Amino acid sequence: MAEECSGNCDSCGSSSDCSDTKKMMEQQNAQIRDNMSKIKYKIAVMSGKGGVGKSTVTVNLAATLNMMGYKVGVLDGDIHGPNIPQMLGVDQIQPMADENGIYPVSTPQGIKTMSIGYFLPDKNTPIIWRGPKASGAIRQFLSDVNWGELDFLLIDTPPGSGDIQITTLQAIPDIDGVVIVTTPEEVSVLDARKSVSAANTLEIPIIGIVENMGGFVCPECDKVIDIFGKGGGEKAAKELNVFFLGRIPLDIKARVASDRGVPMVTMDCKASEEFKKVVNTVLERIKKE
C-alpha cells in the first residue's frame, strides 16, 4: 500500500496491486498456519538489547531439549546478526529446496535449523535491509520452510521490540510464549522490562526471564564471581510479576565450546548444570499452561 494512501480504493489507480498483495498475504498466512500446526510448542526467545546472550540461550535450550529426546527446530530470526549456524556447527552447509519448499539444515544431533546466514556468500557479508524486507524474510521462513513435525520450534528474535520483532511474534499462530533474556546490570534489566511490556501488549504469554552472565566462574578455583552485579533479573521478574527461570554464569569452558560450534550443555561445567535446570523449569511452565 502506498504511503500516501487515502483509504479510498475506488479512486486509486494502484488498488489492484493492493488487492493482489492482500491475496498473497492471505495465502502465505494459510501456509504458515499449516506449517505451524505440525509443531507442538512454539517459543520465541527475546531480549531488549543486543549482547546479552539471547542466541546462546536459544541454542542451548534447543540442544538440551534435543538431548532429552524431543524433535527440535531453531529459526534464526535475527536477520541482521545470524549466528545460529555457526553456534551449532553447521555454517558450512547450504539448505536444499524442491517443489515442497526449503528444507532446514540439520545438525548431526538432528536439530533442524534455518537462517538467512545460510544464503550469504561469506561471513563478512552484511544484511543491509530495512524492516519490511527483513520481516518478509522471517515470514517466508515460517511459510516456505518444510519444518515437518516437531515438538519444539524455537525462534531467536532480533534484539529490541520494533517492527521485525512484532511481525515475527504476530505471524506465529498459537505461540506458546516467550523467554526473555537479560544480564544482571541495570541497563540490560531496564530493556528486559520493555520486552515484558511488549509481550504483554501483544498478549503473548511470558514463560519467564533468564539472567545470563549471572556471575563469572573462576577457572582457578571454580568460584562464581559477580562481576556484572547480582540478582537484577530476579528482582525485575518479581517486580513485573513474571516467573524467574534462573541464572546462567559465564564459563570459559562454555565459551570455548561455543566458538567450536558445540552447545555448552554438552560440556561438564557450571553453566551447563544451571542451564539444564532452566530448561526443566521451562518445560514445567509450558506444560502447565
Curated annotation (Swiss-Prot):
This protein's GO cellular component annotations are: cytosol
Taxonomically, the superkingdom here is Archaea
Q: Which residues bind ATP?
A: 48-55
The Gene Ontology terms for molecular function here are:
ATP binding; ATP hydrolysis activity; ATP-dependent FeS chaperone activity; iron-sulfur cluster binding; metal ion binding
State what changing residue 221 to A does. Answer: Decrease in activity. Lack of activity
The UniProt keyword set, sorted, is: ATP-binding, Hydrolase, Iron, Iron-sulfur, Metal-binding, Nucleotide-binding
GO-annotated biological processes: iron-sulfur cluster assembly
> Which parts of this chain are annotated as the region Disordered?
1-20
UniProt xrefs under InterPro entries? Mrp/NBP35_ATP-bd, P-loop_NTPase, YlxH/NBP35
Quote the biased-composition stretches of kind Low complexity, using this chain's numbering.
Answer: 1-18
Q: What is known of its domains?
A: The N-terminal cysteine-rich ferredoxin-like domain is not required for activity.
Family per record: Belongs to the Mrp/NBP35 ATP-binding proteins family.
Assembly and partners are described as: Homodimer.
Against HAMAP family, the record matches this protein to:
Mrp_NBP35
Give the function comment from the record.
Binds and transfers iron-sulfur (Fe-S) clusters to target apoproteins. Can hydrolyze ATP.
What's the name of the protein?
Answer: Iron-sulfur cluster carrier protein
